[in-house]
Amino acid sequence: MKLAKRVSALTPSTTLAITAKAKELKAAGHDVIGLGAGEPDFNTPQHIIDAAVRSMNEGHTKYTPSGGLAELKNSIAEKFKRDQNIEYKPSQIIVCTGAKHALYTLFQVILDEEDEVIIPTPYWVSYPEQVKLAGGKPVYVEGLEENHFKISPEQLKNAITEKTKAIVINSPSNPTGVMYTEEELSALGEVCLEHDILIVSDEIYEKLTYGGKKHVSIAQLSDRLKEQTVIINGVSKSHSMTGWRIGYAAGSEDIIKAMTNLASHSTSNPTSIAQYGAIAAYNGPSEPLEEMREAFEHRLNTIYAKLIEIPGFSCVKPEGAFYLFPNAKEAAQSCGFKDVDEFVKALLEEEKVAIVPGSGFGSPENVRLSYATSLDLLEEAIERIKRFVEKHS
């Protein structure tokens, strides 16, 4: 059967391809270290699990409103006020089946054919594909490594056309882990206000920040910027709840209403049980979150120092999330590979270390390593990479 053009044009996920190959090697009995994970390696905190079990025993196993439980939307609104001093009414919030689906639904309701969305590179792999699925056109603006992968107001201005509808800002970033400062966000925001561009602020890694740095949302900088922004967030990364599939969007009532209408004809509601777990996540203790954040920071500081000692590797130190995004072009060349993608494939075949080539994130000279695994495995992986480079150089 001939498939729809919009699906046939999709680019397969580089991350999933590497993960599948790693699983294949593991199944064959090889000692594979996988650093492709996009999820915390900690279990969901117990009080959240208990709340979900309790909700089932209390009979909360039926449909909920398409936009999410009122109690959960109230908890999210309280979280915004408590953490970022932003005020949203429940009618300005929609709960979705994960932050990814919140983004998908948003693009579906704001984009018409050929509308343009500015996406800074490097980017999370699903941004351009979701834009294309909604009929839009991704427009890439390069975040240079010497600028810590962040774009400037001038770059943004130069990318704007009469078809520009939105820009995606992801801070802390997947895959780089860098964060925009308040001053940088304010400058980008002024350009967006001047040209009436919607700001899509992906804040899913908000709680995972390091070096004493605190996340800043562009929506908290002014009332005008709040009105011009849709925030995407969820409990997946902050509370180690990736499998629960609870995310949300917060923005103007007209956009949220349209997203809710679309959800009513697509997913209906997010899983009722997971929603009760998310309520417990936002109303429960913060100690498990801080313990996870501290563990990630310790891993980062330990392996970053070892990684940059590998010949041919350079790396901007992350400020958040749980990824390293080093430039490996020089290492690949010194090892005799035509590009970084070939380097990554050979590394997996020979040393059984799975990392993700940066080509899938719009940066073909880089690779992404997740430190969402044990420190022992991380240190062993770095040793294997170093051995691989020294052997081929």
Curated annotation (Swiss-Prot):
InterPro entries hit by this protein: Aminotransferase_I/II_large, AspAT/PAT-like, NHTrfase_class1_PyrdxlP-BS, PyrdxlP-dep_Trfase, PyrdxlP-dep_Trfase_major, PyrdxlP-dep_Trfase_small
Keyword set includes Transferase: yes
Molecular functions per Gene Ontology: L-aspartate:2-oxoglutarate aminotransferase activity; pyridoxal phosphate binding; transaminase activity
Subcellular location as annotated: Cytoplasm
Binding site residues for L-aspartate: 38, 124, 174
GO BP terms: amino acid metabolic process; biosynthetic process
Broadest EC class assigned to this enzyme: transferase
Gene Ontology CC terms, in alphabetical order: cytoplasm
N6-(pyridoxal phosphate)lysine: modified positions: 237
One family name in Pfam for this protein: Aminotran_1_2
Statement: the UniProt record of this protein carries the keyword Cytoplasm: yes
Subunit structure of this chain's protein: Homodimer.
Record-stated family: Belongs to the class-I pyridoxal-phosphate-dependent aminotransferase family.
Name of this chain's protein: Aspartate aminotransferase
Species assigned in the record: Bacillus subtilis (strain 168)
Gene name of the record: aspB
